[in-house]
């Protein structure tokens, strides 16, 4: 399983027989997509930092299936599937289950080729500074995030996650790491890859240093369109 970082919350997971693409908003270098195999495009929600209509153009050159959160306005064309939180959909060799978000749309749990993959979308502990976000209630944000993690733990906790993509948003200041650290503490993924950090790659090393000894690997990377690791 090869993991490629695209940008922001965009990743490619390349398996032996299929490729999974999550929240791609930038042009994908052509050498990262392969013909002669199935390419599944996942979009967690309609925010412009997670969804770009550009991904629909790949259907003309590649064998593609699209799995969109149902808050995205319906697009014409076949092989586009819309899904709400807490639903399941399957295709040959791949099982997909959705969970909720603390913002908009869904988070994805994908099982394929013996691998368990979780993409959080905007499922995050949004602990904003109330001075800059006076309408935010930190206690409510904490409660909602922890409740969703508990639901995930109850429903799929028996499946060890091979990789989880979780927001580490530096705009939250010192609270940027709360979601990832809580996720590791409760769900124990083998690998956790930070996302949603815009261009602030420094948060990756900081999280890795903070989670030394946790048993979860946090790979380091410092650029777009790079291979993060092989697992």
Predicted regions and their residues:
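Active-site environment of divalent metal-dependent phosphoester hydrolases
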Residues: 27-30, 46-51, 72-76, 89, ...
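Active-site-proximal segments of metal-dependent phosphoesterases and phosphodiesterases across multiple
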Residues: 135-144, 163-185
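Short amphipathic alpha-helical segments
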Residues: 33-35, 53-56, 79, 131-132, ...
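Structural motif
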Residues: 20-22, 42, 67, 117-120, ...
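Binuclear metal-ion centers of metallo-dependent hydrolases, dominated by the metallo-beta-lactamase
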Residues: 1-8, 77-89, 102, 150, ...
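Active-site metal-binding motif and surrounding structural segment of the metallo-beta-lactamase
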Residues: 26-72, 153-165
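A short helix->loop->beta-strand "cap" motif at the edges of active sites that frequently abuts
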Residues: 18, 61-65, 187-191
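Core dinuclear metal-dependent hydrolase active-site scaffold
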Residues: 1-36, 79-160, 223-231
